[in-house]
């Protein structure tokens, strides 16, 4: 009788653990992947469409991939910032760093763009 009980306990444990691990992991994986992909795609597209004209477009990954695309996508914003910089003798680089008298303005502009990006990401 003891041997039979041991075998039953062992078989029940293995079946339970198999069912738990198999069903739970598969459900978790599918739910996680779908929720992440949907939230990321929707948040990125909505933020780009809503706040593309307001904020100065300076995304580091785009510059690394191809600077031409970045310049063409944010043409109007670059023109406005350049005209403002020309009036005050400021040289604005593609990274967002500046040289000139109005360093505080450059710093504020840089921080403002980053803060907007952080708000949209999370």
From Swiss-Prot:
Residues 15-31 have a biased composition (Basic residues). Residues 1-81 are annotated as: Disordered. It comes from the Viruses. Residues 32-53, 61-81 have a biased composition (Low complexity). This is Uncharacterized protein R298.
């Amino acid at each position: 009788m003891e041997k039979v009980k041991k075998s039953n306990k062992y078989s029940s444990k293995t079946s339970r653990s198999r069912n738990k691990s198999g069903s739970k992991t598969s459900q978790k994986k599918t739910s996680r992947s779908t929720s992440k992909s949907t939230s990321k795609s929707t948040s990125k597209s909505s933020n780009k469409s809503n706040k593309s004209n307001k904020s100065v477009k300076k995304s580091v990954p785009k510059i690394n991939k191809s600077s031409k695309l970045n310049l063409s996508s944010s043409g109007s914003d670059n023109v406005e910032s350049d005209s403002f910089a020309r009036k005050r003798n400021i040289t604005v680089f593609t990274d967002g760093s500046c040289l000139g008298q109005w360093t505080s303005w450059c710093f504020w502009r840089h921080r403002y763009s980053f803060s907007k990006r952080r708000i949209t990401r999370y």
